[in-house]
């Protein structure tokens, strides 16, 4: 799917329409200290593993877009709900 890199849209911080630049959100670093990771570590041992004994489900064929819209006027960014797209390319 083709999408323009810059376009006019509403900025919730300026409370008016401004030109925004679109960028893909990069995932942050994962940590092993999340509650689910600690629970998995606690429950691993002898006996039934409960919900961890189930086979994890597979991936969907397409992923939802994860985009950040940065305002050209105030410089603040906001997120919006994504949609399913096989491939997302930006037009200059």
Curated annotation (Swiss-Prot):
Source species, please? Haloarcula marismortui (strain ATCC 43049 / DSM 3752 / JCM 8966 / VKM B-1809)
Organism ancestry: Archaea, Methanobacteriati, Methanobacteriota, Stenosarchaea group, Halobacteria
Q: Which GO terms describe its cellular component?
A: ribonucleoprotein complex; ribosome
Cofactor-binding details, from the entry: Binds 1 zinc ion per subunit.
- What does the entry list as the binding residues for Zn(2+)? 11, 14, 71, 74
Q: Where is this region: Disordered?
A: 22-63
Among NCBIfam families, the record links this protein to: PRK05767.1 (NF004425)
Q: What is the protein's quaternary organization?
A: Part of the 50S ribosomal subunit. Interacts weakly with protein L15e. Binds the E site tRNA.
List the C4-type ZnF regions, as residue ranges.
11-74
User: Which Pfam families has this protein been placed in?
Assistant: Ribosomal_L44
Name-wise, this protein is: Large ribosomal subunit protein eL42
Required co-factors: Zn(2+)
């Amino acid at each position: 799917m083709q999408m323009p890199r810059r376009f006019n849209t509403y900025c919730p911080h300026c409370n008016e329409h401004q030109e925004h630049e679109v960028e893909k959100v990069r995932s942050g670093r994962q940590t092993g200290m999340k509650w689910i990771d600690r629970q998995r570590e606690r429950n691993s041992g002898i006996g039934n593993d409960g919900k961890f004994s189930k086979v994890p489900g597979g991936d969907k064929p397409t992923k939802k877009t994860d985009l950040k819209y940065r305002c050209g006027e105030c410089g603040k960014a906001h997120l919006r709900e994504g949609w399913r797209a096989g491939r997302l390319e930006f037009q200059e």
